[in-house]
Amino acid sequence: MGRGTWSWIVPDGLWEIAEPLIPPSKVRPQGGGTQDTPDETVFAAIIYVLVSGCAWRALPPCFGISKSTAHRRFVIWSRAGVWGRLHEEIVHRLYDASLLDLSRAVLDSAHVRAGKGGEHTGPSPVDRGKPGSKMHVLSDANGLPLVVGVSAANVHDSLALKPMVAGHQTRHDPHRGRHFKPQRLHADKAYDVPHLRKWLRGKRIGVRIARKGIESSERLGRRRWVIERTMSWLTGYRRLNHRYERNPRNYLAFLGLAAALCCYKRLVRLTT
């Protein structure tokens, strides 16, 4: 997209990475109809919603699209896995530039309210039982988000460990057959479960999980502070502060796009 129309909201160069991942629009067999809104315009509008937290109906007139067009295209692209693939592509570029630190990975979660309910919501133990969800994040040693996930607020953190770590290890470029694996995993006492420690050792991943009632959280926390910063980066995208989407796939899509933006900004800052 370069320094184009939407450079005020879309980081330079991001559209060029995203464009090949966008599924083609369906063509009416009978022809006719109105001309499709350009994909890059919709892409910019989606990022605006993520950053500002506004409702689809509150999109500024400068985008020149209706709320139904923007939301419909967002749902189609989310179903096609565009946001996860965009995040993955940027993570690979970071790896190619030797900007990922896999000497350790850090895992944590954060609660978000989900007033509209829907799948993957439940009574939040930290919000007086109100409906909520959790965002789960696995980062590298520098806090770059590698894998993101969503669960109900009443699901125990430990249940996310295997899916998050397995998702990290199976993210690979099919043309290179390359797998990423951290040397050690840092997490707080919520993940202190014997069978998870055994599972990690079976994967040849060092276990640095705080033990309940034994190890000081302050000592191990020296390595885990980066994930708190990562959560701050992600929740800086206002659409993530409250889950408005009843469909968890759509909330996960916004979370994946936010993770992609965090990683892309680091890539640009360290390579230009």
Specify the residue positions occupied by each region the protein language model found:
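Short alpha-helical elements
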Residues: 1-272
